[in-house]
Amino acid sequence: MVYHVQFPGLGLDLTVNRVALAIGGFNIYWYGVIIAAGMLLAMLYAFRNAVDYGIDSDRLVDVVAIGTVMAIVCARIYYVAMAPFAYQSLWDMIDIRKGGIAIYGAVIGAFVFGALAAKWRKVPLLPLFDLVSLGFLIGQGIGRWGNFVNQEAFGTNTTLPWGMYSEGTEAYLKSVQVTLPAGVTVDPAAPVHPTFLYESIWCLVGFAVLASFYKKRRFNGQIFLGYIIWYGLGRAWIEGLRTDSLLIGNTGLRASQLVAIGSVIVAAALMVIGLRNAKGKPLMVPLAVKDLKKQAEAGDRFTPDTLPVGAPHAEFVKATDAMNARLDALDLSEVEIEEIETPKE
């Protein structure tokens, strides 16, 4: 489907085709391509900076793979669970090519299953959460443009210069007049808030803020809590503008808004506790050990090095390589013979 998207206040008139590529009778949609691009950039950021968090990039691969797959699965489950009777078949429920995923489902799935994978692969949990939170902001900031191509995730009417109109927004608003959240009225033929754009900007600004702060973090998990607070505040506001919110049953309550507000409150409380506990204690980062088996065999003969959290990236790379080279060179072939004292007669 092709949409003619207008921004009357800006004098812009765009033609947007939802289909990126057609192979035989199978369409590949821009929505999926954009989501995948956001994920890829998030992964590249995580792998490049893993060493700064004391995380081995080889073990991170498994954690990211599991977390990514389960993020997609849980994002769809969350979305379908809010309106299970809207789907005619099991295939309709699992087909995400046309959209229909919920970001909070993705967040829950990624962090829960990522935590399980981290335990399995012996990746430090809170530093992992700090790292992938920044990746999430990249992925969300880029991925929201998939909503633009689909002409979804927009808001109520606006007279602001960047108000958006298309036949897609008009058709959707005409079809949902009786199911809009309580107190929401719209004119289908008038421009609407491009809330996908608001969230994209909010996430990318959040990434810039938290990424510039990560070398100053006071405790492990602080960046993760900052992400929950930052994203939750923005989502609570933006969700209030949207016309396609997932509602909780027949209550009229917006699911994402409640989750956002609740998560902000909990994260803010944990942030205060974490800062109090970290007062006067500089954060040191244990460097990532590649060969965990040899480390275990070495016992007291090998202790991982640490660096202060504010050390430059290049120093983390150099020190980590040197430490692992030292472990590789450690000779464990000699069997230590315990000296036994001969009892006195």
Description of each model-found segment:
Residues M1-E345:
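A feature for loop-to-transmembrane-helix boundaries and adjacent hydrophobic helices
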